[in-house]
């Protein structure tokens, strides 16, 4: 939600930002907001004038009564004023609703460093890490995707896709999950279950070491939390509703964490508030028909460890960089080659002022795929959820800035581990950082196993 004062004081900035985002149909909204706002302020001014006049009449009525003079004319006039005030208050309320309709549907103002573009093809890679394993048939494409800025090892044998590795390793059952729940669901089995849990504890431990408070949030939230955290379009495309209840299954722990301090004034000395949450996530994935229909990359249900920060406005951009660095460190420990991408205006979404994605190299697929998103939402969520802070009790509260970043979405991290650490025979080596959590150092194909999860 945007600050109405920003639109009053700098409407051209807002219009230009909408143009950069490709939201051309909303540019006319700004003039309409200004027109409604001017009318709203005029009516408020008239209400205040009438209240002042009514107070003067009340004083005059008191004087006349004391003097034994008639007051009927003044009482009639006061009654008319009260009636007019009531009418104006209704008009003001209606104008406020119309203004809020637009304010609640406008995207955040982008940071100047966000590249202008139409879609994901215009996102800008800003750094690369690791030594990629590249099948010779993918080499030309890899060199283009990595801009020649990444070390690589050419493989003569073709790496398998994660969905095929899961079958070879006995790690998932998609057919029975489809029977029970439909498409984009899965049963995880055997060592992959332990790997999923290991990734959760690994990410939690690393972030707790950095001062984050661990949280398991509610897995369902009320509508006001979702409305405050995301866009209305997500209610159709992403979020599952519980029938007959004012409850929604969370698509990410970001949302219950954003709602955690709704309608609160925080003590400035407590900022920043650093949270790391574990939760399952539930997503409709509407509008993704035909994309990643096999495997566990794009699914309706998955586990995720999420970073979330409540920050002072002047510190939020520093925290944005720190959050993405935290996630990078996790993937470096997992020995997953990746690139960090600055997301362009057309792919940014409404909530974030700036977003970085970490995209892991997937040798089986021969391309980089998103595994982390890190966003600075500035005060967009805080205004909708009314989250403020102050340093002194006599100080006017200010809105906090909220930031979020994936630490690890386990299903996508598993995809990256399987594809990057596979051997030619289908065995998958477990990254050293996870050994103490898994209790085993590799996963071997089913035909070579003597039992699950052997060291």
Curated annotation (Swiss-Prot):
Name this polypeptide is given: Serine--tRNA ligase
Organism: Pyrococcus furiosus (strain ATCC 43587 / DSM 3638 / JCM 8422 / Vc1)
GO biological process: selenocysteine biosynthetic process; seryl-tRNA aminoacylation
PROSITE patterns to which the protein is assigned, alphabetical: AA_TRNA_LIGASE_II (PS50862)
Lineage top rank: taxon: Archaea
Keywords of the record: Aminoacyl-tRNA synthetase, ATP-binding, Cytoplasm, Ligase, Nucleotide-binding, Protein biosynthesis
Positions bound to ATP: 283-285, 299, 370-373
Enzyme Commission code(s) on record: 6.1.1.11
